[in-house]
Regions:
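Conserved non-transmembrane functional hotspots
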Residues: 265-585, 595-707
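Acidic/glycine-enriched connector segments
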Residues: 5-266
Length: 707
């Protein structure tokens, strides 16, 4: 299977980017992931290479054939686990890569086999290349030099943080890094009796994470580990199946298909038998169709299938801005620090994230991840820099842009419906003052019906467009992609990510897409020494975590976002609560005034009091209806927005991020790779927990008619 380049690569020059933003922004993004599988190979340093070609060559050939078959089926015969939508990119062939530590005869021979097969190779060395070469046997140095000069070597990561005196720790880090950067691990030894405890533990962890694990099970046989269906411990409850046998090959095919999110068996082509509808069933179906025609789809937007969700995602368009300004209008009206001016146009920050907004003097707003981009271009190699830009950064920008768009659509819809419901009630009550003017009353009724029609149309549009569901999905995707750039700099982005299951069955495509994207991310090249770790830790501290704005200095990162969101959400919640109480208070005042006038009229039967109470009665009726209605509008917007919960969550996140920032700043003094990996794992978990809480807050906040 030949590896081909995708066509064409999105523009990277600033001038080209700016021109594309104005004409065809979608062309800047490679959205569909490339079908990719990374095969990691680990072995003892002293393992003999004799059996490697006999075992590895047929396995790699079989994997190539499987991927070619999967990719051809996805292209020409849609019928995936996600429905009939094609999941993977069609402008590039499937990509099979070999990841190995080049640590001895066996892994060097594995690299030679992959090189002759034309497969891309990504190598992770336990030391810098010079030290690594010195620890090899004289005969192995020639193979090592040949591997480094190979045109198929696409990534070379040198773990230069541990001295050769601590060879055990260095070997363990290299092996764990290979496994973390792989989707399928082949151990060139007996996994039941591993050559050392570290490899055994690493393989156990790989089994438990759901990774495919293969091992030698004889002189010229290799087997696949298959956990039992009801396994309590996937690392212990299972069996080995030889991939030479038909049963083992079938299990490997099914396991690889599951990992890629593809169907394990071809889709059924049988024609379903036509259903017989009774007259009663036809009547019910007609009533449901009439209901949907007026009010839109029944139930919540989560009824959309994974197929339609993924297909819609691929068909989306990146947007520079929009006119759905309901939430921004709400902020302008009900926050203490108002926006500079009200504007109907909402900026989605597509150009700011992609290329920045520099001023004439060179200052201004920088592009998103600009510090990380500079680090990648200087220290991580051209292949990684290109993959980082097009696979991680631009897909995050795309997902973030869509999330902003649909959040504005959704928020504008529910704010608009609540506000219009108040307008409809106001029109009905104000018609009291029209007296006997029948024509004007008829006009008022028509206007009220038009307002109600606008409410129903907004409700129907939200249901049909699934604005709420798309916002939830795209925000979850963006929040999964953004923090992944940090472990990617360490070559530690795992394709085995498992997102928290959602109550929305249509959201499973998000986890599939994130895993497919992570498998595409190439290995960075260069030395990963203490200086490199300090740079990466500094990026995590300053760019991802950031700091709050103070002393006239603009804030940055997640701390600045959560600080601002806490303040804004608190003011929104508080002011909506205050105005709702004010309307109820005014209702009480209006009612008390009417009762007082009535009592004065009762005890002093004069024409003056009679005239006053007769004139005030319609106004009291109108105020008694309109004021509570707008109080309910304020409370409804406050309840659906749930600004209080959002403010409290942001406050908690600021405290957690500040603790992580202190931990990172302490690690910068004397960084170690394994501790840095643990810190990034903790940071990713903290951000994932925040996303989970946010999803719980807004998952059931669907748009209503406002009544």
């Amino acid at each position: 299977m030949n590896v081909v380049q995708r066509t064409p690569a999105p523009a990277t020059d600033v001038t080209d980017l700016r021109a594309a933003l104005e004409t065809d922004a979608k062309s800047l993004f490679q959205i569909e992931p490339r079908m990719t599988v990374r095969v990691g190979v680990v072995a003892r340093s002293r393992d003999e290479p004799g059996a490697v070609p006999v075992i590895l060559d047929p396995v790699l050939s079989y994997l190539q054939d499987l991927l070619h078959d999967f990719h051809r089926s996805d292209r020409h015969a849609p019928g995936s686990a996600l429905g009939t939508v094609r999941q993977y990119a069609q402008d590039a062939d499937a990509d099979l890569r070999l990841v190995c530590p080049l640590s001895g005869p066996a892994t060097l021979e594995a690299a030679r086999v992959a090189r002759e097969a034309g497969l891309p190779i990504e190598a992770i060395l336990r030391y810098n290349r010079q030290t690594h070469r010195e620890i090899l046997a004289p005969d192995d140095r020639i193979s090592f030099d040949t591997a480094l000069e190979s045109p198929t070597l696409e990534g070379l990561l040198e773990l230069d943080t541990i001295s050769p005196q601590n060879s055990r720790m260095a070997r363990r880090l290299a092996e764990r890094s290979v496994i973390a950067h792989s989707d399928l691990v082949i151990y060139l030894g007996d996994a039941e009796n591993p050559s050392n405890q570290e490899i055994g533990l690493a393989l156990q962890e790989a089994k438990r994470s759901g990774m495919l694990v293969m091992s030698m099970c004889g002189p010229q046989r290799i087997c696949l580990w298959e956990p039992d269906t009801l396994a309590v411990d996937p690392a212990e409850d299972g069996d080995w199946y030889s991939v030479v046998d038909p049963e083992g090959q079938q299990k490997l095919r099914h396991a690889l298909a599951r990992m890629l999110g593809l169907p394990e068996t071809p889709p059924s082509t049988a024609t379903p038998e036509p259903s017989v509808r009774t007259p009663w069933g036809a009547l019910i179906g007609g009533l449901r169709s009439a209901w949907r025609a007026v009010f839109g789809p029944e139930g919540h937007g989560s009824s959309r299938s994974e197929e339609s969700c993924l297909e819609d995602f691929y068909a989306e368009e990146a947007r520079v801005g929009g006119n759905h300004c309901g939430f921004y209008t709400l902020r302008w009206l009900f926050t203490e620090n108002r926006l500079p001016r009200w504007s109907r146009h909402v900026d989605y920050r597509l150009d700011a994230n992609l290329i920045g907004r520099p001023d004439a003097d060179g200052s201004g707003e920088a592009a998103a991840w600009i510090e990380t981009i500079d680090h990648v271009r200087q220290h991580c190699g051209e292949t990684f820099a290109e993959g980082f830009e097009h696979i991680l950064r631009r897909r995050w920008i795309y997902a973030d842009n869509l999330a902003i768009h649909y959040s504005n659509l959704y928020r504008t819809a529910y704010i608009k419906n609540f506000a219009l419901s108040g307008v409809a009630v106001s029109i009905a009550l104000l018609s009291i003052f029209l007296g006997g003017l029948t024509g004007l009353k008829a006009i008022a009724v028509v206007v009220e019906l038009l307002v109600i029609r606008a409410i129903i149309r907004t409700f129907k549009a939200e249901k049909e467009g699934a604005w709420h569901q798309r916002w939830m999905h795209y925000r979850a995707l963006a929040e999964a992609l953004r923090p992944s750039r940090l472990p990617a700099l360490l070559g530690n982005v795992s394709g085995q990510l498992a997102l928290t299951p959602s109550v929305d069955p249509g959201s499973n495509w998000v986890a599939w897409y994130v895993r497919a994207t992570f498998r595409e991310v190439p290995l960075p090249s260069g030395k990963l020494d203490q200086d490199a770790l300090r740079r990466v830790l500094k990026l995590a501290s300053e760019e991802e975590i950031g700091e709050a704005a103070k002393d006239g200095k603009q804030g940055s990162g997640q701390i600045a976002f959560h600080t601002s969101n806490h303040r804004r959400s608190y003011h929104l919640d508080h002011n909506l609560h205050v105005w709702a109480n004010r309307t109820l208070t005014l209702t009480i005042v209006a009612g008390v005034a009417f009762v007082a006038l009535y009592l004065l009229y009762t005890f002093n039967d004069s024409k003056l009091w009679k005239k006053m109470i007769s004139g005030y009665k319609p106004l009291a009726t109108v105020l008694g209806g309109i004021l509570p209605t707008y109080g309910a509008v304020f409370f409804g917007i406050r309840a659906v927005g749930d600004f209080r919960a959002s403010a409290h969550q942001s406050e908690r996140m600021v405290r957690q991020l500040e603790r992580l920032k202190l931990m990172i700043e302490g690690e910068i003094q004397d960084p170690h790779l394994h501790r840095t990996q643990d810190i990034f794992a903790l940071l990713s978990k903290t951000l994932a927990d925040d996303q989970r809480v946010w999803a719980m807050i807004y998952a059931e906040r669907e748009v209503t008619q406002g009544f």
